[in-house]
């Protein structure tokens, strides 16, 4: 039985850090586990320009403890008003690695998102020319579409036509949740990839809905049926380089989750790598974790793999029931329960 795992230090290719005084509560947990992270731009107001992204980067670095060497990889928030020249500025900055597409209203702070992709074709052409990846929250927001079908319908109605018009566009379909998304990525050319979260590997929609509403398991895209969870596990453990780690760790105050209309988002940075190890161990595929966590992401982004390592030890520990979050608290994924793997300090 494996009791110790030494891995090339991984990166998180989908992370929410928030802003302001919450940064000092959130950044350290990621920096202890990951060397780099793609930082989501859906602040309020969103990060829509290179100037804003570089300023946000400075705030993140200022919140980092002195003993950590964590690099935030910045992104821009695509809006109906984004111009091609901004894409050039982003690429030339040396610190912006992608542009994020949120369909308007699809998730937290997506009010400024895109309402019509066709109006942004000049921007998408610039992204294709600059080879700057487009990161996509792949769900439709049509109220007539069942929430459990929004990812599948987005792929069929929007993503396939988009890639027909921009075949060389580098795309990451973020936080995939369905068998249909797995099938699409597997059949797609090498410029198309996907991230997978720990919570979508470990849980199906029973965690959210069975035995009473569990607001701390509410995220977007929502947890799906067990058949879809199994498809995600098979993809993550397959060794296919198109699938890589992206936690989508998204902290919200406890009071914003435990309410009549709670926010979508699951916070997992406190134990992200440990939770991935648990999922891979359950699938008898621990030997595949390093490639998924440490190799596939940088290879897709054209970045060097990290040179240092992290070590996980098979020592159960109890996740705190809550963690500090500004003037409030947040409930971490698996709060108050035991996780099988521990990060060696």
UniProtKB/Swiss-Prot annotation:
Cofactor: Zn(2+)
In-chain residues carrying the UniProt-annotated modification N6-carboxylysine: 100
Keywords: Hydrolase, Metal-binding, Pyrimidine biosynthesis, Zinc
GO BP of this protein: 'de novo' pyrimidine nucleobase biosynthetic process; 'de novo' UMP biosynthetic process
Binding, substrate: 16-18, 42, 137, 220, 252, 264
Cofactor note (record): Binds 2 Zn(2+) ions per subunit.
Gene Ontology CC entries for this record: cytosol
Listed EC numbers: 3.5.2.3
Described purpose of this protein according to its UniProt entry: Catalyzes the reversible cyclization of carbamoyl aspartate to dihydroorotate.
Protein name per its UniProtKB record: Dihydroorotase
């Amino acid at each position: 039985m494996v009791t110790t795992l030494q891995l090339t230090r991984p990166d998180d290719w989908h992370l929410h850090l928030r802003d302001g005084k919450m940064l000092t509560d959130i950044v350290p947990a990621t920096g202890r586990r990951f060397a780099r992270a793609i930082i989501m731009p859906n602040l309020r107001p969103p990060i829509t320009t290179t100037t804003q992204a570089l300023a946000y980067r400075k705030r993140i670095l200022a919140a980092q403890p002195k003993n950590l060497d964590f690099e935030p990889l910045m992104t821009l928030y695509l809006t109906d008003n984004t111009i091609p020249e901004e894409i050039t500025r982003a690429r030339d900055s040396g610190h912006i690695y992608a542009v994020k597409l949120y369909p308007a209203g699809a998730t937290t702070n997506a009010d400024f998102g895109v309402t019509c992709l066709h109006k942004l074709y000049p921007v998408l052409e610039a992204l294709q020319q600059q080879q700057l990846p487009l990161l996509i929250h792949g769900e439709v927001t049509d109220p007539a579409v069942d929430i459990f079908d929004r990812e599948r319908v987005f792929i069929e109605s929007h993503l396939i036509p988009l890639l027909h018009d921009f075949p060389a566009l580098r795309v990451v379909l973020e936080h995939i949740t369905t068998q249909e998304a797995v099938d699409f990525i597997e059949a797609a050319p090498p410029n198309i990839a996907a991230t997978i979260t720990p919570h979508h590997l470990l849980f199906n929609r029973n965690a959210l809905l069975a035995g009473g509403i569990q607001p701390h398991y509410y995220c977007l895209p929502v947890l799906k049926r067990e058949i879809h969870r199994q498809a995600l596990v098979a993809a993550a453990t397959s060794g296919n380089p198109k699938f890589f780690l992206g936690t989508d760790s998204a902290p919200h105050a406890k009071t914003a989750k435990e309410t009549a209309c709670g926010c979508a988002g699951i916070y997992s940075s406190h134990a992200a790598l440990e939770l991935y190890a648990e999922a891979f161990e359950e699938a008898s595929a621990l030997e595949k974790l390093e490639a998924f966590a440490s190799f596939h992401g940088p290879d897709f982004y054209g970045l060097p793999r990290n040179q240092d390592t992290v070590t996980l030890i098979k020592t159960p520990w109890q996740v705190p029931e809550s963690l500090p979050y500004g003037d409030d608290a947040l409930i971490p994924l698996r709060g108050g329960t035991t996780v099988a793997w521990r990060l060696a300090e």
